Design a protein with these regions (language model features):
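Helix-to-loop junction immediately C-terminal to a conserved catalytic motif
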Residues: 68
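Helix N-cap at the start of a conserved alpha-helix in ABC-type nucleotide-binding domains
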Residues: 181-183
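H-loop (His-switch) and adjacent beta-strand-loop-beta switch element
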Residues: 214-230
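Catalytic Walker B motif of ABC-type/P-loop ATPase nucleotide-binding domains
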Residues: 170-174
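Conserved ABC ATPase signature
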Residues: 145-149, 153
Length: 247
């Protein structure tokens, strides 16, 4: 796979150029010989909220993993506009309960990209961690073990870790799945605020209400892109019925 860092713009009919934060072309990826992404081509607009929508197994998590750099694509091109490396928040189930880490230690891991694993945190690093924990409302959980936290608390700690990376590209895999309404609303408001502050946010979601409130939508089925654009144009009743119709 080819990875490039540059600037790309597209011009909608009758509109102004829209900057792309990420463009991917003919991506292919999978697990141990099982293909998941198949000739996937699309883009993520900068300074916007993009929702990845599709059934289980459609390739949402794999695409996020490729964009985050934690999954290697076997073919295709991936182009990033100028910016910091992406921050990735995996599904809650991907983070084990038995990890012997406190909430604060988990958030501090967000500084490893800049400091390295063995170098001590600087005063600035600690300030960044404090700020991220305060923003997510988890400062009072600093000394608690990760495995002791509720689902909503743990998810906020993981998002705080991503904020500690100070990235302008945030990738989240089902960030509100399984959370109570209050926790979902809190995270939704935070992500909206981050976009307003200049962060590009991409989230995989089964929540059609959340997808409809996004700025852009990528519709996936069987590892292929079957729709891309504004949610009101992509998430039509016909498209959604086809999406979950048995193959």
């Amino acid at each position: 796979m080819t990875i490039m860092f540059n600037k790309h713009s597209v011009v909608p009919p009758g509109g102004e150029p829209t900057r792309e934060r990420v463009r991917f072309s003919n991506l292919e990826a999978g697990y141990r010989g099982r293909p998941v992404l198949r000739q996937l081509s699309g883009s993520v607009p900068a300074l916007a909220m993009t929702a990845l929508v599709g059934p289980n197994g459609s390739g949402k998590s794999t695409l996020l993993g490729v964009l985050a750099g934690v999954i290697h694509a076997t073919a295709g091109q991936l182009r990033y506009a100028e910016g910091r490396p992406p921050a990735f928040v995996p599904q809650r189930g991907a983070v084990g309960d038995a990890l012997p880490l406190t909430a604060r230690q988990t958030v501090e891991m967000g500084r490893w990209n800049e400091r390295g694993l063995w170098r001590p945190l600087t005063r600035r690093d600690r300030t960044v961690v404090d700020s991220a924990m305060e923003r997510l409302g988890v400062a009072d959980l600093a000394a608690r073990q990760l495995g002791e936290l509720s689902g909503g608390q743990r998810q906020r700690v993981l998002i705080a870790q991503s904020l500690a990376q100070r990235s302008d590209l945030l990738l989240l895999d089902e960030p509100t799945t399984g959370l109570d309404p209050e926790a979902r609303e809190r995270i939704t408001v935070l992500l909206t605020d981050l976009v307003a502050e200049g962060t590009t946010v991409v989230q995989a979601t089964h929540d059609l209400e959340a997808a409809r409130s996004a700025d852009a939508c990528l519709l996936l089925r069987d590892g292929r892109l079957v729709g891309q654009g504004p949610p009101e144009e992509v998430l039509t009743p016909t498209a959604l019925s086809r999406l979950w119709r048995p193959a």
